[in-house]
């Protein structure tokens, strides 16, 4: 079997993207890094996004840190998901930054969360800490769009969380709010503050927040598509 090669330009079709992702299945992160002339870090403490960046290189992703999808021409977002030996997610999945001001008139249909999740290429990667980073294998990819029930679940959580933000209750939101979608602080340090609306409608400074998919949502998603043993 010939070795895969990184895509040098963004894929032109979903079929091309999925075929490339399927070629990576079974390879270790160390093998993929070496094939592209990259050094695998010892761990992810200082390189938290390294796995995502590595797979973006292999798949020809275009967006980088821009707000559009990773494969903008296809409308597809890439999500790597660390899993245990049974294929179950080990952590929540970051979706996007939560806007804490200027949300007047925003609906679920026009929201950034829905935009990011309308078409996702999920790539599970072994994530147990007992496995050295370079030896962790890439799993089988899944090209997914939310079905009617999943869309309803996400919409209900999003509406509840956005109501709290708009009504000045952002400081009261905890990771327990939302059944499948949660909001929690997203900042490397406590000094990175952003504007939000306070309880009396005043401007306050608070930690930036991000939307995350809870493990119960992604676990059910992977199980439904037979990616969990």
Swiss-Prot record:
Cellular component terms (Gene Ontology): cytoplasm
Protein function: Sequence-specific endonuclease that cleaves unmethylated GATC sequences. It is involved in DNA mismatch repair.
InterPro entries reported in the protein's UniProt record: DNA_mismatch_repair_MutH (IPR004230), DNA_rep_MutH/RE_typeII_Sau3AI (IPR011337), DNA_rep_MutH/T2_RE_sf (IPR037057), Restrct_endonuc-II-like (IPR011335)
HAMAP family from the UniProt entry: MutH
Gene: mutH
A GO BP entry: mismatch repair
The entry's keywords: Cytoplasm, DNA damage, DNA repair, Endonuclease, Hydrolase, Nuclease
Coiled-coil positions: none
Record-linked Gene3D superfamilies: DNA mismatch repair MutH/Restriction endonuclease, type II (3.40.600.10)
Main location: cytoplasm
GO molecular function: DNA binding; endonuclease activity
Name of this protein: DNA mismatch repair protein MutH
Ribosomal protein found in the keyword field: no
Pfam families with a match to the protein in the record: MutH
Domain of life: Bacteria
Membership in a protein family: Belongs to the MutH family.
Keyword Nuclease: yes
Subcellular location(s) of the protein: Cytoplasm
NCBIfam families recorded: mutH_TIGR, PRK05070.1
């Amino acid at each position: 079997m010939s070795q895969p090669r990184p895509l040098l330009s963004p894929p032109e079709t979903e079929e091309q993207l999925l075929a490339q992702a399927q070629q990576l299945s079974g390879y270790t992160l160390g093998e993929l890094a070496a094939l592209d002339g990259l050094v695998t870090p010892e761990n992810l403490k200082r390189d938290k996004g390294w796995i995502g960046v590595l797979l973006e290189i292999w798949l020809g992703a275009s967006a980088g840190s821009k707000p559009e999808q990773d494969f903008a021409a296809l409308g597809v977002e890439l999500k790597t998901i660390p899993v245990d030996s049974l294929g179950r997610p080990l952590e929540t999945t970051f979706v996007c930054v939560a806007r804490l001001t200027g949300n007047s008139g925003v609906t679920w249909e026009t929201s950034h969360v829905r935009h990011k999740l309308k078409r996702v290429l999920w790539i599970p990667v072994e994530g147990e800490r007992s496995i050295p980073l370079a030896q962790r294998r890439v799993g089988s990819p899944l090209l997914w769009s939310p079905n009617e029930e999943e869309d309803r679940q996400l919409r209900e959580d999003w509406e509840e969380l956005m109501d709290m933000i708009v009504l000045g209750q952002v400081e009261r939101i905890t990771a327990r709010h939302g059944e499948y979608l949660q909001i929690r602080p997203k900042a490397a340090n406590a000094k990175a503050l952003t504007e939000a609306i306070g309880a009396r409608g005043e401007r306050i400074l608070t930690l930036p927040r991000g939307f995350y998919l809870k493990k119960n949502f992604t676990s059910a998603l992977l199980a439904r598509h037979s990616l969990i043993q």
